[in-house]
Amino acid sequence: MKKLIYIIVGIAGILGALSRYYLGLTIHEFWHHTFPLATLLINLAGCFLLAWLTTYIAKRNLLPSDVITGIGTGFIGSFTTFSTFSVETVQLINYSEWSIAFLYVSCSILGGLIMSGLGYTLGDFLLKKHLTEGDHL
């Protein structure tokens, strides 16, 4: 049964990568500026989702642990992209787009922490709500 985790993570990884690719294409349809908005929004969404998943879904045991691992490591891990963030930042610097690079790095780091905090806060709030209503973990 433990070999199933590799399949779950692999399938979730495929779905996360495809979701990132198509969402990126969709954002690029509407955003035609130098600032890499698609990567930023995708990474911020991933920060929120991973924090919420690990704070609420995992602690409530709403899904089997293998599925949670698949979503967190596979889907969210392939949906978000640190390497694209890094390469886009280096490209902005190479093109002397210093202010955009600084804004991008700042928004990515601060925004990622804020979105993780919001995901954690929402998950914690929902967890406490269910516990006060007499639900069990």
Swiss-Prot record:
It is a multi-pass membrane protein. GO terms for cellular component: plasma membrane. GO terms for molecular function: fluoride channel activity; metal ion binding. The keyword Acetylation does not apply. It is found in: Cell membrane. Na(+) binds at residues 77, 80. InterPro entries: FluC (IPR003691). Na(+) is not transported, but it plays an essential structural role and its presence is essential for fluoride channel function. The chain crosses the membrane at residues 4-24, 37-57, 67-87, 100-120. It catalyses: fluoride(in) = fluoride(out). It comes from the Bacteria. The keyword Acyltransferase does not apply. Keywords: Cell membrane, Ion channel, Ion transport, Membrane, Metal-binding, Sodium, Transmembrane, Transmembrane helix, Transport. One of its GO terms (biological process) is cellular detoxification of fluoride. HAMAP family: FluC. Belongs to the fluoride channel Fluc/FEX (TC 1.A.43) family. PANTHER family: FLUORIDE EXPORT PROTEIN 1-RELATED. Fluoride-specific ion channel. Important for reducing fluoride concentration in the cell, thus reducing its toxicity. This is Fluoride-specific ion channel FluC 1.
